Amino acid sequence: MKSLLPIIALVLFVFGPARAQNPEGVWEGEIQDPKRPTVINVDFKTRRVSFSGTAPTTITQPALPSNDNRVRFQVANGAQTLKFAARQDGTRLTGEMDTGSRTIPFYLELLPSLPKPVGRAEAWQQDIDVVISRFLRYDRSYTAARREATRARLQALRAKVDRMSDQAITVELARAVALSGNAHTRLYLMRNRTEVRRVPIRVWWFGRELRIVSAATEYANLIGCRVTGIGRWNLPSAFSMVRNIKAGNASWQRYMSAYFLTSPDLLFGAGVLPNPERLPLTVSCGGRTRRVTVNPLPLRRSSTPVEAWWDLAPAYPHVDGLKPALAVEKAPPYLRHPDRNYWVEYLDAPAIVYLQYNRAQEMSSEPMADFIRRVTRTLDEHSIKGLIVDVRFNTGGDAGVGTPLVEALAARSKGLPVVVLTGRATFSAGITHAAQWKQFANASIIGEPAGDGLDLWSEGGNLLLPNSGLTVHYANGFHAYSVKDYPAFKPYFSDLNVATLVPDRVVEVSWSNYAAGRDPVLEAALARIRKSS
């Protein structure tokens, strides 16, 4: 949701009087802030340091040796200097970091140097060992029982990698990580990053129907078709076989399945397909059922996030030139601006302000402070009967960006009905803002259930696996948004007091709604405000 340590600008290492040897090799540990630890990785030989898996910074100053096992180094971060002081005891450094206003304990341990793997099996085993020895140490979302179950499953996987395909190993590794039950704890495969192949079609759940909402030119005749089977499996069976490749509730599983069900690599790894080089589908189009085969695109590994909901928006510029099911001119308001993190519109007839917040991230074209001024000006210029806040597609980012918006508008909307629209892609900071509106503006909730619960582990960082190049994300900051108390998880990273985010009225867009350019969720919100005013 938000990184605690900003970008590092300069690191200075200072050691005491010259006699003893400097620490050598790569060291890793935690700055032990009780709200959210920060993993620090230091290579004393190459003089590089990184925090929470972010890009390393080059240390430009040479280290000086010490004769009393003390190690001191400084991190210049803008106007702030983080001062580290530690004592070395063999392969462990223990000390404190001084921020200028507080001191926080930290430790570093020497990481073992991995030999070059002999063969594919050993390469995977080294990656699994990193997950066991380092990832499980840093992720705080596991209960003791779940941590041991994950460790056991990883050990079992380690013992049989020589008999498994790369795709099957990847899926099993993801499932082991997902035993945490926490949706932020995951192996990156799709969405945040792209590590597997996809076919040039995109799908979306409309109720129980999985429809093809966009496709490449050669598969354009499949647009609008309903998928009823994958490989030899009916759709419910195929869906069940890709569930829990990532942890998460039923809504989040539906959202993530829009990715997984279009990846022959993951479908093969999960046992849905016998061959990852083609995706056989059973589709129903215009009352006629037929079998088709879709071929995967070449793998393009990327660390750029890709949101499945973009496939619903005809104006979104698809990289692969996919043709949308919906014409641009038919798109309802919630699908008109997929390129904007936030935007607002005054709906004149019902005198309602509709605000869509798609991404918890500042826009350079309109900083949040400017946006808040524009929205409050709209509220001041009109006799408003209600406010609708749409976070159906807000999968997160930095909750600190949108919090001032909630605070400003909640104060301005006192006495007005406020309705928040949620959906399967309301996640992470999106849930934070839905909960804030519920608590501070007594908002009603309409739409689909959100993609996670009120209480969750987030924050954290990334660990790169040395051979596969895959990345695991650990979570270590607890967000307590419900009325339930968690003494063992205090101090909370973030705290609210909300009874529930279950929608007051569950409304979902059907395929016929979508094809007609209708938004029944917004319609239900407008009706609720009209009834209240």
Predicted region positions:
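Positively charged n-region of N-terminal signal peptides that target proteins for export
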Residues: 1-4
